[in-house]
Amino acid sequence: MSDILDEIVIEDVVANCPQEFLQYHKCIRDNEENPGKCKDGRMILSTCIREKVPSVKSIMSECSEPMKKYDQCIRDNMGTRTINENCLGFLQDLRKCAELQVKNKNIKPSINGVNLELIKD
């Protein structure tokens, strides 16, 4: 389900924040040596995602506890290079919660209420 979760969220982002997504990724492509130049685009895309992407809004709302624990683990282990070892369990808990949100709410990428899966077929 992890790959499916990633695909659903990415499709949802592209569907609901297309300009922001394209502008940010174009900036990254054009500034491979210095991706820091794309900070503004990253912030604009992040804001759009938080405000307009249904799957992300649901995950952020319903999975705030595992998200906080994972974030705290990253902060606590940033200087020790042990993030993978110490935080993997928190990441797995967060992904399980996110998968449940997508699965239980039957979230599928859509634009203005039109299910994109219907368009693909």
From Swiss-Prot:
PROSITE patterns for the chain: CHCH
Coiled-coil spans in chain: none
Main location, first listed in the record: mitochondrion
Residue ranges constituting the CHCH domain according to the UniProt record: 14-56, 60-105
Organism: Saccharomyces cerevisiae (strain ATCC 204508 / S288c) (Baker's yeast)
UniProt cross-references to Pfam families, sorted A to Z: CX9C
Motif Cx9C motif 2: chain residues: 38-48
TM ranges: none
Compartment list: Mitochondrion intermembrane space
GO CC term (a single one): mitochondrial intermembrane space
Motif Cx9C motif 1: chain residues: 17-27
GO biological process, any: cellular respiration
Gene3D superfamilies, per the entry: 1.10.287.2900
Protein name, entry field: Mitochondrial intermembrane space cysteine motif-containing protein MIX14
Superkingdom to which the source organism belongs: Eukaryota
Keywords recorded for this protein, A-Z: Disulfide bond, Mitochondrion, Repeat
Disulfide cysteine pairs (residue numbers): C17-C48, C27-C38, C63-C97, C73-C87
InterPro entries hit by this protein: CHCH_domain-containing_protein, CX9C, Mix14
Motif (Cx9C motif 3): 63-73
Motif (Cx9C motif 4): 87-97
